[in-house]
Amino acid sequence: MKRALSVKDILSKKYEVFPFEGKWKEAFDTPERTGVWFIWGNSGNGKTSFVMQLCKELCKYDRIAIDSLEEGTRLTVQNNLKRFGMAGVSRHLAFIKEDIPALKERLRRHKSYNIVVIDSFQYTRMTYSDYIQLKEEFPDKLFIIISHARGKHPKGDAATSVMYDADLKIWVEGYVAYSKGRYRGSTSKYVIWELGALENGSK
């Protein structure tokens, strides 16, 4: 049995974090580099645009694999890559389209990707138990899980449970991403598209 940690143990522990600056820090502070982030929102509110911007920022710190189960490599994906200038981070960003067993095999390899974006949770057909197994097998990875929404809530009971478990919960609405999780900066929101946010009354 492992010994219990004291308050001093926890206070003296060093954590690996993303040293966000500017509007990223204002929205999400400096979150840990491992764990689970959960992003959800309704179609047409800027969710895909936010994920692209987030990936571009995270590519400063590590390599990312986007498991694009929903869109694959369709023209819409290519258009978004062009729109957000993702060619500049191409050495750190890769697209795959793999079910969860295949993704696990990839992540077990030496020097596998440390950041994995799963788009979308509904397309994985994972149960909450499946999700816990994935998270526990790879505690040194960061999983960013994208979810459909039903109203203001994640679509499906399993997705809702994952949202509650996630370290960083990001709700996207009216071209603004709101931090609802354990990491919040001074504003707790990130404006994805200024004009869109103004037109939607989100800014």
Stretch-by-stretch model annotation:
Residues R33-A102:
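Conserved P-loop
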Residues T34, Y61-D62, Y113, D140, ...:
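Short, well-ordered alpha-helix to beta-strand connector turns
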Residues N45, G72-T73, P101-A102, F121-M126, ...:
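Short acidic, S/G/P-rich loop/turn micro-motifs used as interaction or catalytic elements
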Residues A94-I146:
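Phosphate-binding/switch loop-helix module in NTP-utilizing enzymes
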Residues E136-K203:
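Phosphate-binding/switch region of NTP-binding enzymes
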